[in-house]
Amino acid sequence: MGRMHAPGKGLSQSALPYRRSVPTWLKLASDDVKEQIYKLAKKGLTPSQIGVILRDSHGVAQVRFVTGNKILRILKSKGLAPDLPEDLYHLIKKAVAVRKHLERNRKDKDAKFRLILIESRIHRLARYYKTKRVLPPNWKYESSTASALVA
């Protein structure tokens, strides 16, 4: 997928395995994987961090192939899903960091410009999540309250 605010074409991407069945060497059952997901979520890890740990430490390449559901759906069914979607959370965190940098370095014009780009991505993503009903319709990003969202 191409980059939004950069000249790169972004051609590299991960290749999913052709076979969607569970590997024969994997000894974990669906319930074991779900228990691992719940345990890691209670530690405060994000869904992507949970996926990386399951892949690297437990040999679960794709949780969806083993359990039949994605990690976020499993967390939602148990009520452990994060309030903000992960990509939106990281954009807000980045905007807070740039704004903090701008408080110390007022004349940094490039950072000011990059902050505008980051905040436009936040608004665009928030609009998408409102239409998908992930965020409530009255949710609004405000730079003054953003640091409280990511703290």
From Swiss-Prot:
Q: Which UniProt keywords apply?
A: Acetylation, Cytoplasm, Isopeptide bond, Nucleus, Phosphoprotein, Ribonucleoprotein, Ribosomal protein, Ubl conjugation
GO function term, MF aspect, one: small ribosomal subunit rRNA binding
Q: How is it modified after translation?
A: Ubiquitinated at Lys-27 by RNF14 and RNF25 in response to ribosome collisions (ribosome stalling).
This chain belongs to the protein called: Small ribosomal subunit protein uS15
Q: Please give the organism.
A: Cricetulus griseus
Q: Where in the cell is it found?
A: Cytoplasm; Nucleus, Nucleolus
Cross-link Glycyl lysine isopeptide (Lys-Gly) (interchain with G-Cter in ubiquitin) lies at: K27
N6-acetyllysine-modified residues are K27
The subunit field of the Swiss-Prot or TrEMBL record says: Component of the small ribosomal subunit. Part of the small subunit (SSU) processome, composed of more than 70 proteins and the RNA chaperone small nucleolar RNA (snoRNA) U3.
Q: Which residues carry this modification: Phosphoserine?
A: S30
Q: Which residues carry this modification: N6-succinyllysine?
A: K27, K34
Give all Phosphotyrosine modified positions.
Y38
Its main localization is cytoplasm
Tell me which PANTHER family the record gives: RIBOSOMAL PROTEIN S15P/S13E, SMALL RIBOSOMAL SUBUNIT PROTEIN US15
Glycyl lysine isopeptide (Lys-Gly) (interchain with G-Cter in SUMO2) crosslink residues: K43
In this record, what's one Pfam family?
Answer: Ribosomal_S15
Family under the similarity heading: Belongs to the universal ribosomal protein uS15 family.
